[in-house]
Curated annotation (Swiss-Prot):
This is CTP synthase. HAMAP family: PyrG (MF_01227). Keywords: ATP-binding, Glutamine amidotransferase, Ligase, Magnesium, Metal-binding, Nucleotide-binding, Pyrimidine biosynthesis. The lineage of its organism: Bacteria, Pseudomonadati, Pseudomonadota, Gammaproteobacteria, Vibrionales. The gene is pyrG. It comes from Vibrio vulnificus (strain YJ016). GO terms for molecular function: ATP binding; CTP synthase activity; glutaminase activity; identical protein binding; metal ion binding. The keyword Membrane does not apply. L-glutamine binds at residues 352, 380-383, 403, 470. Residues 1-266 are annotated as: Amidoligase domain. CTPSs have evolved a hybrid strategy for distinguishing between UTP and CTP. The overlapping regions of the product feedback inhibitory and substrate sites recognize a common feature in both compounds, the triphosphate moiety. To differentiate isosteric substrate and product pyrimidine rings, an additional pocket far from the expected kinase/ligase catalytic site, specifically recognizes the cytosine and ribose portions of the product inhibitor.
Protein backbone atom coordinates (compact mmCIF):
# COMPACT_ATOMS: atom_id res chain seq x y z
CA UNK A 1 0.00 0.00 0.00
CA UNK A 2 1.34 3.43 -0.98
CA UNK A 3 1.10 5.91 1.86
CA UNK A 4 0.46 9.61 1.30
CA UNK A 5 1.72 12.13 3.84
CA UNK A 6 0.32 15.36 5.28
CA UNK A 7 2.90 17.21 7.37
CA UNK A 8 1.37 19.60 9.89
CA UNK A 9 3.34 22.56 11.24
CA UNK A 10 2.45 25.57 13.37
CA UNK A 11 3.48 29.21 13.32
CA UNK A 12 3.24 32.57 15.14
CA UNK A 13 2.40 31.13 18.59
CA UNK A 14 2.18 27.74 20.27
CA UNK A 15 -1.04 26.05 21.45
CA UNK A 16 -2.93 26.89 18.26
CA UNK A 17 -4.54 23.47 18.14
CA UNK A 18 -2.43 21.62 15.57
CA UNK A 19 -3.39 18.32 17.14
CA UNK A 20 -7.12 19.06 17.01
CA UNK A 21 -6.93 20.33 13.43
CA UNK A 22 -4.90 17.32 12.31
CA UNK A 23 -7.18 14.86 14.13
CA UNK A 24 -10.29 16.53 12.67
CA UNK A 25 -8.92 16.18 9.15
CA UNK A 26 -8.07 12.55 9.92
CA UNK A 27 -11.64 11.96 11.12
CA UNK A 28 -13.06 13.28 7.84
CA UNK A 29 -10.68 11.20 5.72
CA UNK A 30 -11.54 8.13 7.79
CA UNK A 31 -15.24 8.89 7.26
CA UNK A 32 -14.51 8.76 3.53
CA UNK A 33 -13.35 5.16 3.91
CA UNK A 34 -9.60 5.79 4.01
CA UNK A 35 -7.21 4.05 6.38
CA UNK A 36 -5.58 6.86 8.33
CA UNK A 37 -2.86 7.03 10.95
CA UNK A 38 -1.26 9.95 12.80
CA UNK A 39 2.14 10.75 14.25
CA UNK A 40 3.49 13.38 16.63
CA UNK A 41 7.15 14.44 16.44
CA UNK A 42 8.26 16.28 19.58
CA UNK A 43 11.44 18.41 19.41
CA UNK A 44 12.24 18.35 23.13
CA UNK A 45 15.28 16.45 24.41
CA UNK A 46 13.45 14.23 26.92
CA UNK A 47 13.44 10.63 25.67
CA UNK A 48 9.69 10.52 26.30
CA UNK A 49 7.22 12.54 28.42
CA UNK A 50 7.01 9.81 31.09
CA UNK A 51 9.06 11.66 33.71
CA UNK A 52 7.97 15.20 32.81
CA UNK A 53 5.94 17.31 35.23
CA UNK A 54 2.20 17.21 34.43
CA UNK A 55 1.97 20.92 35.26
CA UNK A 56 4.51 21.71 32.54
CA UNK A 57 3.65 19.23 29.83
CA UNK A 58 0.12 18.08 30.60
CA UNK A 59 -0.90 14.46 30.91
CA UNK A 60 1.08 11.49 29.66
CA UNK A 61 -1.09 9.46 27.30
CA UNK A 62 -0.47 5.70 27.42
CA UNK A 63 -0.94 3.62 24.28
CA UNK A 64 -2.10 0.00 24.16
CA UNK A 65 1.47 -1.22 23.70
CA UNK A 66 2.67 0.74 26.74
CA UNK A 67 4.29 3.82 25.22
CA UNK A 68 4.24 6.98 27.36
CA UNK A 69 3.37 9.65 24.82
CA UNK A 70 2.25 13.21 24.20
CA UNK A 71 -1.34 14.09 25.10
CA UNK A 72 -2.04 14.83 21.42
CA UNK A 73 -2.13 11.07 20.84
CA UNK A 74 -5.17 11.08 23.10
CA UNK A 75 -6.84 13.52 20.72
CA UNK A 76 -5.91 11.29 17.81
CA UNK A 77 -7.55 8.23 19.37
CA UNK A 78 -10.65 10.19 20.33
CA UNK A 79 -11.13 11.38 16.74
CA UNK A 80 -10.19 8.28 14.71
CA UNK A 81 -10.56 4.52 15.18
CA UNK A 82 -6.87 3.72 14.55
CA UNK A 83 -5.05 2.82 17.76
CA UNK A 84 -1.78 4.61 18.39
CA UNK A 85 1.41 2.74 19.28
CA UNK A 86 4.96 3.55 20.36
CA UNK A 87 5.73 4.21 16.68
CA UNK A 88 3.28 7.12 16.55
CA UNK A 89 5.21 9.46 18.85
CA UNK A 90 8.92 10.12 19.24
CA UNK A 91 11.07 12.94 20.56
CA UNK A 92 14.39 14.54 19.66
CA UNK A 93 15.74 12.92 22.82
CA UNK A 94 14.76 9.47 21.59
CA UNK A 95 16.32 10.11 18.18
CA UNK A 96 19.60 11.44 19.59
CA UNK A 97 19.76 8.65 22.17
CA UNK A 98 19.36 5.93 19.54
CA UNK A 99 21.76 7.56 17.07
CA UNK A 100 24.41 7.90 19.79
CA UNK A 101 23.87 4.27 20.82
CA UNK A 102 24.47 3.20 17.21
CA UNK A 103 27.63 5.33 17.11
CA UNK A 104 28.92 3.66 20.28
CA UNK A 105 28.30 0.23 18.76
CA UNK A 106 30.21 1.24 15.65
CA UNK A 107 27.22 1.01 13.31
CA UNK A 108 28.36 4.12 11.41
CA UNK A 109 31.81 2.65 10.71
CA UNK A 110 33.72 5.61 12.10
CA UNK A 111 31.77 8.34 10.27
CA UNK A 112 31.45 11.82 11.75
CA UNK A 113 27.93 11.89 13.23
CA UNK A 114 26.01 15.02 12.20
CA UNK A 115 22.48 16.40 12.34
CA UNK A 116 22.41 16.03 8.57
CA UNK A 117 22.34 13.23 7.50
CA UNK A 118 22.31 11.01 10.60
CA UNK A 119 19.65 12.68 12.75
CA UNK A 120 17.43 13.59 9.80
CA UNK A 121 17.73 10.08 8.33
CA UNK A 122 16.67 8.55 11.64
CA UNK A 123 13.63 10.85 11.76
CA UNK A 124 12.67 9.94 8.19
CA UNK A 125 13.02 6.22 8.91
CA UNK A 126 10.75 6.50 11.94
CA UNK A 127 8.10 8.37 9.97
CA UNK A 128 8.15 5.79 7.16
CA UNK A 129 8.11 2.80 9.55
CA UNK A 130 5.33 4.27 11.68
CA UNK A 131 3.01 4.90 8.76
CA UNK A 132 3.17 1.68 6.76
CA UNK A 133 -0.12 0.05 5.80
CA UNK A 134 -2.18 3.26 5.68
CA UNK A 135 -3.63 5.35 2.85
CA UNK A 136 -2.81 8.62 4.59
CA UNK A 137 -0.42 9.47 7.43
CA UNK A 138 -0.84 12.85 9.11
CA UNK A 139 2.44 13.84 10.75
CA UNK A 140 2.37 16.69 13.28
CA UNK A 141 5.62 18.45 14.15
CA UNK A 142 5.53 19.92 17.65
CA UNK A 143 6.60 23.45 18.47
CA UNK A 144 6.52 26.58 16.33
CA UNK A 145 8.27 27.33 13.04
CA UNK A 146 11.45 29.24 13.86
CA UNK A 147 12.25 27.30 17.04
CA UNK A 148 15.86 26.10 17.01
CA UNK A 149 15.02 22.66 18.37
CA UNK A 150 12.51 21.88 15.61
CA UNK A 151 14.91 22.57 12.71
CA UNK A 152 16.12 18.94 12.29
CA UNK A 153 12.48 17.80 12.10
CA UNK A 154 11.61 20.48 9.54
CA UNK A 155 14.60 19.50 7.42
CA UNK A 156 13.66 15.82 7.69
CA UNK A 157 10.08 16.34 6.47
CA UNK A 158 11.33 18.65 3.69
CA UNK A 159 13.70 15.92 2.51
CA UNK A 160 11.03 13.24 2.85
CA UNK A 161 8.61 15.20 0.66
CA UNK A 162 11.28 15.45 -2.04
CA UNK A 163 12.20 11.77 -1.81
CA UNK A 164 8.67 10.34 -1.97
CA UNK A 165 7.50 12.91 -4.53
CA UNK A 166 5.37 16.00 -4.09
CA UNK A 167 2.34 14.14 -5.47
CA UNK A 168 2.40 12.06 -2.26
CA UNK A 169 3.19 14.84 0.21
CA UNK A 170 1.35 17.92 1.46
CA UNK A 171 2.27 20.60 3.97
CA UNK A 172 -0.49 22.01 6.16
CA UNK A 173 0.50 25.05 8.20
CA UNK A 174 -1.52 26.36 11.15
CA UNK A 175 -1.17 30.03 11.87
CA UNK A 176 -2.79 32.79 13.90
CA UNK A 177 -4.91 35.53 12.31
CA UNK A 178 -5.68 37.87 15.23
CA UNK A 179 -8.59 40.31 15.32
CA UNK A 180 -7.69 43.83 16.49
CA UNK A 181 -10.71 45.51 18.01
CA UNK A 182 -9.12 48.97 17.68
CA UNK A 183 -8.76 48.52 13.92
CA UNK A 184 -11.94 46.50 13.55
CA UNK A 185 -10.29 43.91 11.33
CA UNK A 186 -8.26 40.73 11.28
CA UNK A 187 -4.53 41.03 10.67
CA UNK A 188 -2.77 38.78 8.17
CA UNK A 189 0.80 39.99 8.65
CA UNK A 190 1.73 37.38 11.32
CA UNK A 191 0.63 34.66 8.90
CA UNK A 192 2.67 36.16 6.07
CA UNK A 193 5.78 36.28 8.24
CA UNK A 194 5.22 32.73 9.49
CA UNK A 195 5.01 31.43 5.92
CA UNK A 196 8.11 33.45 5.04
CA UNK A 197 9.93 31.67 7.89
CA UNK A 198 8.73 28.32 6.56
CA UNK A 199 9.86 29.20 3.03
CA UNK A 200 13.32 30.09 4.35
CA UNK A 201 13.85 26.43 5.30
CA UNK A 202 12.58 25.17 1.96
CA UNK A 203 8.95 24.34 2.74
CA UNK A 204 6.07 25.82 0.73
CA UNK A 205 2.77 25.17 2.52
CA UNK A 206 -0.03 23.70 0.41
CA UNK A 207 -2.78 24.48 2.93
CA UNK A 208 -3.05 27.29 5.46
CA UNK A 209 -5.37 26.74 8.42
CA UNK A 210 -6.01 30.14 9.96
CA UNK A 211 -6.91 30.24 13.64
CA UNK A 212 -9.03 33.18 14.70
CA UNK A 213 -11.94 34.05 16.96
CA UNK A 214 -14.11 34.46 13.84
CA UNK A 215 -14.36 33.29 10.24
CA UNK A 216 -11.77 35.00 8.02
CA UNK A 217 -13.53 37.38 5.57
CA UNK A 218 -13.26 36.50 1.86
CA UNK A 219 -11.12 39.55 1.03
CA UNK A 220 -8.61 38.66 3.77
CA UNK A 221 -8.48 35.04 2.60
CA UNK A 222 -7.71 36.30 -0.89
CA UNK A 223 -4.95 38.50 0.54
CA UNK A 224 -3.43 35.58 2.49
CA UNK A 225 -3.57 33.38 -0.62
CA UNK A 226 -1.83 36.00 -2.76
CA UNK A 227 1.02 36.77 -0.37
CA UNK A 228 1.54 33.21 0.86
CA UNK A 229 1.48 31.60 -2.58
CA UNK A 230 -1.41 29.18 -2.01
CA UNK A 231 -4.78 28.83 -3.80
CA UNK A 232 -7.59 30.78 -2.16
CA UNK A 233 -9.58 27.59 -1.57
CA UNK A 234 -6.59 26.27 0.41
CA UNK A 235 -6.94 29.07 3.00
CA UNK A 236 -9.12 27.44 5.66
CA UNK A 237 -10.77 29.35 8.51
CA UNK A 238 -10.71 27.58 11.86
CA UNK A 239 -12.60 29.86 14.20
CA UNK A 240 -13.07 29.38 17.93
CA UNK A 241 -15.93 26.99 18.69
CA UNK A 242 -17.53 25.87 21.93
CA UNK A 243 -16.74 22.21 21.26
CA UNK A 244 -13.70 20.66 19.59
CA UNK A 245 -15.99 18.01 18.13
CA UNK A 246 -17.47 20.63 15.81
CA UNK A 247 -14.13 21.10 14.02
CA UNK A 248 -14.52 18.19 11.56
CA UNK A 249 -17.75 19.69 10.20
CA UNK A 250 -16.24 23.19 10.15
CA UNK A 251 -13.26 22.25 7.99
CA UNK A 252 -15.24 19.83 5.82
CA UNK A 253 -17.67 22.63 4.96
CA UNK A 254 -14.68 24.48 3.46
CA UNK A 255 -13.59 21.50 1.35
CA UNK A 256 -10.33 20.63 3.10
CA UNK A 257 -10.79 16.90 2.56
CA UNK A 258 -11.54 17.46 -1.13
CA UNK A 259 -8.24 19.34 -1.49
CA UNK A 260 -6.38 16.41 0.05
CA UNK A 261 -8.08 13.75 -2.07
CA UNK A 262 -7.54 15.78 -5.25
CA UNK A 263 -3.85 16.24 -4.48
CA UNK A 264 -3.29 12.54 -3.80
CA UNK A 265 -5.49 11.35 -6.65
CA UNK A 266 -7.77 9.50 -4.23
CA UNK A 267 -11.27 8.69 -5.43
CA UNK A 268 -13.26 8.22 -2.22
CA UNK A 269 -16.96 8.60 -1.37
CA UNK A 270 -18.22 11.67 0.49
CA UNK A 271 -17.58 11.66 4.22
CA UNK A 272 -20.39 10.39 6.41
CA UNK A 273 -20.21 12.57 9.53
CA UNK A 274 -23.50 11.37 11.04
CA UNK A 275 -21.72 10.02 14.13
CA UNK A 276 -20.17 13.44 14.74
CA UNK A 277 -23.52 15.13 14.14
CA UNK A 278 -24.96 12.87 16.85
CA UNK A 279 -22.14 13.84 19.24
CA UNK A 280 -22.80 17.54 18.61
CA UNK A 281 -26.55 17.07 19.07
CA UNK A 282 -26.08 15.25 22.39
CA UNK A 283 -23.68 17.93 23.58
CA UNK A 284 -26.06 20.75 22.66
CA UNK A 285 -29.18 19.16 24.15
CA UNK A 286 -28.57 17.96 27.71
CA UNK A 287 -31.56 17.16 29.91
CA UNK A 288 -29.78 18.09 33.14
CA UNK A 289 -26.40 18.82 34.67
CA UNK A 290 -24.06 17.43 37.29
CA UNK A 291 -21.06 18.78 39.16
CA UNK A 292 -18.12 16.43 39.57
CA UNK A 293 -15.42 17.20 42.09
CA UNK A 294 -12.00 16.21 40.76
CA UNK A 295 -9.66 16.03 43.74
CA UNK A 296 -6.08 16.25 42.51
CA UNK A 297 -2.73 17.98 42.92
CA UNK A 298 -2.09 19.26 39.37
CA UNK A 299 -5.28 21.30 39.05
CA UNK A 300 -3.51 24.53 38.03
CA UNK A 301 -3.18 22.93 34.57
CA UNK A 302 -6.39 21.10 33.56
CA UNK A 303 -4.48 19.48 30.67
CA UNK A 304 -2.75 17.37 33.33
CA UNK A 305 -6.05 15.46 33.46
CA UNK A 306 -6.99 15.89 29.78
CA UNK A 307 -8.24 12.37 29.09
CA UNK A 308 -10.18 12.25 32.37
CA UNK A 309 -11.84 15.57 31.55
CA UNK A 310 -12.81 14.32 28.10
CA UNK A 311 -14.02 10.95 29.41
CA UNK A 312 -16.34 12.74 31.86
CA UNK A 313 -17.74 14.82 29.01
CA UNK A 314 -18.20 11.70 26.85
CA UNK A 315 -20.12 10.06 29.70
CA UNK A 316 -22.23 13.20 29.93
CA UNK A 317 -23.14 12.80 26.26
CA UNK A 318 -24.25 9.21 26.82
CA UNK A 319 -26.42 10.27 29.77
CA UNK A 320 -27.61 13.54 28.17
CA UNK A 321 -26.12 15.46 31.08
CA UNK A 322 -23.94 18.56 31.05
CA UNK A 323 -20.86 17.82 33.17
CA UNK A 324 -19.35 20.63 35.22
CA UNK A 325 -15.92 19.77 36.59
CA UNK A 326 -14.95 21.46 39.85
CA UNK A 327 -11.23 21.13 40.44
CA UNK A 328 -10.40 20.68 44.12
CA UNK A 329 -6.80 20.94 45.28
CA UNK A 330 -6.21 17.96 47.55
CA UNK A 331 -4.09 20.18 49.80
CA UNK A 332 -7.15 22.40 50.32
CA UNK A 333 -9.02 19.37 51.64
CA UNK A 334 -6.20 18.93 54.17
CA UNK A 335 -6.12 22.57 55.29
CA UNK A 336 -9.76 23.65 54.91
CA UNK A 337 -11.49 20.38 55.64
CA UNK A 338 -14.08 18.34 53.77
CA UNK A 339 -16.39 21.38 53.61
CA UNK A 340 -14.79 22.10 50.22
CA UNK A 341 -16.40 18.87 48.97
CA UNK A 342 -19.94 19.77 49.94
CA UNK A 343 -22.51 20.24 47.18
CA UNK A 344 -20.81 17.89 44.74
CA UNK A 345 -22.87 15.30 42.89
CA UNK A 346 -19.92 12.89 42.69
CA UNK A 347 -16.21 12.74 43.49
CA UNK A 348 -13.36 11.52 41.29
CA UNK A 349 -9.78 11.06 42.49
CA UNK A 350 -7.45 10.63 39.47
CA UNK A 351 -3.92 9.27 39.27
CA UNK A 352 -0.86 11.05 40.60
CA UNK A 353 2.59 10.64 42.10
CA UNK A 354 4.30 11.84 45.28
CA UNK A 355 3.04 12.48 48.80
CA UNK A 356 1.98 16.12 48.42
CA UNK A 357 -1.76 16.31 49.07
CA UNK A 358 -2.11 12.57 49.66
CA UNK A 359 -3.99 12.93 52.95
CA UNK A 360 -6.46 15.25 51.23
CA UNK A 361 -7.23 12.54 48.69
CA UNK A 362 -7.71 10.01 51.49
CA UNK A 363 -10.11 12.42 53.20
CA UNK A 364 -12.03 12.81 49.92
CA UNK A 365 -12.46 9.03 49.70
CA UNK A 366 -13.64 8.96 53.30
CA UNK A 367 -16.12 11.79 52.69
CA UNK A 368 -17.55 9.99 49.66
CA UNK A 369 -17.86 6.70 51.54
CA UNK A 370 -19.48 8.15 54.64
CA UNK A 371 -21.85 10.51 52.81
CA UNK A 372 -22.88 8.04 50.09
CA UNK A 373 -21.53 10.31 47.34
CA UNK A 374 -20.71 8.44 44.08
CA UNK A 375 -16.95 7.86 43.95
CA UNK A 376 -14.64 6.87 41.11
CA UNK A 377 -10.98 6.28 41.92
CA UNK A 378 -8.39 5.92 39.18
CA UNK A 379 -4.90 4.49 39.82
CA UNK A 380 -3.80 6.41 42.94
CA UNK A 381 -7.51 7.12 43.44
CA UNK A 382 -8.03 3.39 44.02
CA UNK A 383 -5.08 3.18 46.36
CA UNK A 384 -6.27 6.05 48.57
CA UNK A 385 -9.75 4.50 48.73
CA UNK A 386 -8.16 1.25 49.91
CA UNK A 387 -5.94 3.05 52.44
CA UNK A 388 -8.93 4.96 53.82
CA UNK A 389 -11.01 1.79 54.15
CA UNK A 390 -8.16 -0.07 55.82
CA UNK A 391 -7.65 2.72 58.35
CA UNK A 392 -11.23 3.55 59.21
CA UNK A 393 -13.20 0.35 58.62
CA UNK A 394 -10.76 -2.57 58.78
CA UNK A 395 -9.11 -1.28 61.97
CA UNK A 396 -5.64 -0.99 60.45
CA UNK A 397 -4.60 2.26 62.09
CA UNK A 398 -1.87 4.10 60.20
CA UNK A 399 -2.27 1.97 57.07
CA UNK A 400 -0.51 3.51 54.09
CA UNK A 401 1.36 2.93 50.85
CA UNK A 402 5.10 2.33 51.01
CA UNK A 403 5.38 5.04 48.35
CA UNK A 404 4.56 7.57 51.07
CA UNK A 405 5.54 5.79 54.31
CA UNK A 406 8.05 2.95 54.13
CA UNK A 407 7.73 2.28 57.87
CA UNK A 408 3.95 1.93 58.07
CA UNK A 409 2.70 -0.95 60.22
CA UNK A 410 0.13 -1.80 57.55
CA UNK A 411 1.64 -1.40 54.05
CA UNK A 412 -1.62 -2.08 52.21
CA UNK A 413 -0.08 -0.76 48.97
CA UNK A 414 3.46 -1.64 47.92
CA UNK A 415 5.89 -1.60 44.99
CA UNK A 416 5.15 -4.19 42.32
CA UNK A 417 8.27 -6.29 41.83
CA UNK A 418 6.85 -8.74 39.31
CA UNK A 419 3.90 -9.01 36.95
CA UNK A 420 2.83 -10.67 33.72
CA UNK A 421 2.50 -8.33 30.73
CA UNK A 422 -0.08 -8.46 27.92
CA UNK A 423 2.03 -10.97 25.97
CA UNK A 424 2.50 -13.34 28.91
CA UNK A 425 6.07 -12.26 29.68
CA UNK A 426 7.19 -11.74 33.28
CA UNK A 427 8.29 -8.15 33.99
CA UNK A 428 10.46 -7.38 37.02
CA UNK A 429 11.29 -4.10 38.80
CA UNK A 430 13.18 -3.06 41.93
CA UNK A 431 13.46 0.14 43.94
CA UNK A 432 16.77 0.84 42.18
CA UNK A 433 15.19 0.77 38.70
CA UNK A 434 15.24 4.01 36.70
CA UNK A 435 12.15 6.22 36.84
CA UNK A 436 11.75 6.46 33.07
CA UNK A 437 9.91 3.65 31.30
CA UNK A 438 9.90 1.25 34.26
CA UNK A 439 6.26 1.29 35.30
CA UNK A 440 3.62 -1.31 34.57
CA UNK A 441 2.49 0.10 31.25
CA UNK A 442 -0.01 -0.57 28.50
CA UNK A 443 -3.10 -2.69 27.95
CA UNK A 444 -3.54 -5.61 30.34
CA UNK A 445 -6.25 -8.24 30.71
CA UNK A 446 -8.50 -8.02 33.76
CA UNK A 447 -10.93 -10.64 35.12
CA UNK A 448 -14.16 -9.24 36.59
CA UNK A 449 -15.91 -11.02 39.45
CA UNK A 450 -19.51 -12.20 39.13
CA UNK A 451 -22.19 -10.17 40.86
CA UNK A 452 -20.12 -6.98 41.01
CA UNK A 453 -20.93 -3.52 39.76
CA UNK A 454 -17.83 -3.67 37.57
CA UNK A 455 -19.13 -6.80 35.81
CA UNK A 456 -22.54 -5.16 35.42
CA UNK A 457 -21.07 -1.96 33.94
CA UNK A 458 -18.75 -3.67 31.46
CA UNK A 459 -21.16 -6.48 30.59
CA UNK A 460 -18.26 -8.91 30.31
CA UNK A 461 -16.18 -11.20 32.50
CA UNK A 462 -12.88 -10.03 30.96
CA UNK A 463 -11.72 -6.60 29.82
CA UNK A 464 -8.53 -4.93 28.59
CA UNK A 465 -7.49 -1.59 30.10
CA UNK A 466 -4.30 0.47 30.12
CA UNK A 467 -1.99 0.83 33.10
CA UNK A 468 0.65 3.28 34.30
CA UNK A 469 1.79 2.64 37.86
CA UNK A 470 4.48 1.17 40.11
CA UNK A 471 2.46 0.31 43.21
CA UNK A 472 -0.23 -2.30 43.83
CA UNK A 473 -2.43 -3.71 46.59
CA UNK A 474 -0.44 -5.81 49.08
CA UNK A 475 -1.92 -9.32 48.81
CA UNK A 476 -0.68 -10.23 52.29
CA UNK A 477 -3.09 -7.71 53.84
CA UNK A 478 -5.86 -8.12 51.30
CA UNK A 479 -7.83 -10.80 53.25
CA UNK A 480 -8.13 -8.51 56.27
CA UNK A 481 -9.54 -5.68 54.14
CA UNK A 482 -11.94 -7.98 52.28
CA UNK A 483 -13.14 -9.42 55.59
CA UNK A 484 -14.08 -5.87 56.60
CA UNK A 485 -16.42 -5.65 53.60
CA UNK A 486 -14.47 -4.19 50.68
CA UNK A 487 -14.97 -6.18 47.47
CA UNK A 488 -12.18 -6.98 45.02
CA UNK A 489 -14.05 -6.94 41.72
CA UNK A 490 -11.17 -7.14 39.23
CA UNK A 491 -7.97 -9.20 39.07
CA UNK A 492 -5.00 -9.26 36.68
CA UNK A 493 -4.47 -11.87 33.95
CA UNK A 494 -2.69 -14.21 36.38
CA UNK A 495 -5.29 -13.34 39.07
CA UNK A 496 -2.57 -12.15 41.44
CA UNK A 497 -2.90 -8.35 41.28
CA UNK A 498 -5.93 -6.34 42.38
CA UNK A 499 -7.24 -4.26 39.46
CA UNK A 500 -10.63 -3.07 40.76
CA UNK A 501 -12.35 -2.63 44.10
CA UNK A 502 -15.84 -1.55 45.11
CA UNK A 503 -17.87 -1.01 48.25
CA UNK A 504 -21.04 -3.17 48.30
CA UNK A 505 -22.45 -1.08 51.15
CA UNK A 506 -22.40 2.11 49.08
CA UNK A 507 -24.72 3.13 46.21
CA UNK A 508 -21.79 3.70 43.79
CA UNK A 509 -18.21 3.39 45.01
CA UNK A 510 -15.88 1.91 42.37
CA UNK A 511 -12.14 2.27 41.85
CA UNK A 512 -9.66 0.91 39.32
CA UNK A 513 -5.90 0.52 39.29
CA UNK A 514 -5.90 1.05 35.52
CA UNK A 515 -6.69 4.20 33.52
CA UNK A 516 -10.09 3.81 31.81
CA UNK A 517 -9.95 7.40 30.53
CA UNK A 518 -7.44 6.40 27.83
CA UNK A 519 -10.01 4.31 25.96
CA UNK A 520 -13.00 6.67 26.18
CA UNK A 521 -14.17 8.33 22.95
CA UNK A 522 -16.93 10.86 22.18
CA UNK A 523 -18.68 8.41 19.87
CA UNK A 524 -18.56 5.36 22.17
CA UNK A 525 -17.98 6.71 25.68
CA UNK A 526 -16.72 4.29 28.34
CA UNK A 527 -18.86 2.04 30.59
CA UNK A 528 -17.10 2.98 33.83
CA UNK A 529 -17.46 6.72 33.26
CA UNK A 530 -20.99 6.36 31.89
CA UNK A 531 -22.04 4.49 35.03
CA UNK A 532 -20.33 7.08 37.21
CA UNK A 533 -22.07 10.03 35.55
CA UNK A 534 -25.40 8.19 35.62
CA UNK A 535 -24.99 7.77 39.39
CA UNK A 536 -24.03 11.45 39.71
CA UNK A 537 -27.23 12.39 37.88
CA UNK A 538 -29.30 10.20 40.16
CA UNK A 539 -27.61 11.77 43.18
CA UNK A 540 -28.32 15.27 41.84
CA UNK A 541 -32.00 14.38 41.46
CA UNK A 542 -32.18 12.65 44.84
CA UNK A 543 -32.79 9.26 43.20
CA UNK A 544 -29.56 7.45 44.14
CA UNK A 545 -30.24 4.13 45.85
Amino acid sequence: MTTNYIFVTGGVVSSLGKGIAAASLAAILEARGLKVTMMKLDPYINVDPGTMSPTQHGEVFVTEDGAETDLDLGHYERFIRTKMTKRNNFTAGRVYSDVLAKERRGDYLGATIQVIPHITNDIKDRVINGSQGHDVAIVEVGGTVGDIESLPFMEAIRQLAVEIGRERAMFMHLTLVPYLAAAGEVKTKPTQHSVKELLSIGIQPDILVCRSDRMIPANERKKIALFCNVPEKAVISMKDVDSIYKIPQLIKSQGLDDLVCARFGINAPEADLSEWEQVIYEEANPTGEVTIGMVGKYIELPDAYKSVNEALKHAGLKNRLSVNIKYVDSQDVETKGVEVLQGLDAILVPGGFGDRGIEGKILAAKYARENKVPYLGICLGMQVALIEYARNVAGMEGAHSTEFNKDTKYPVVGLITEWVDSEGNVEERTESSNLGGTMRLGSQLCHLAKGTKARELYGSDTIHERHRHRYEVNNNLRPQIEKAGLKVSGLSADKKLVEMIENPNHPWFVAAQFHPEFTSTPRDGHPLFSGFIKAAGENARGELK
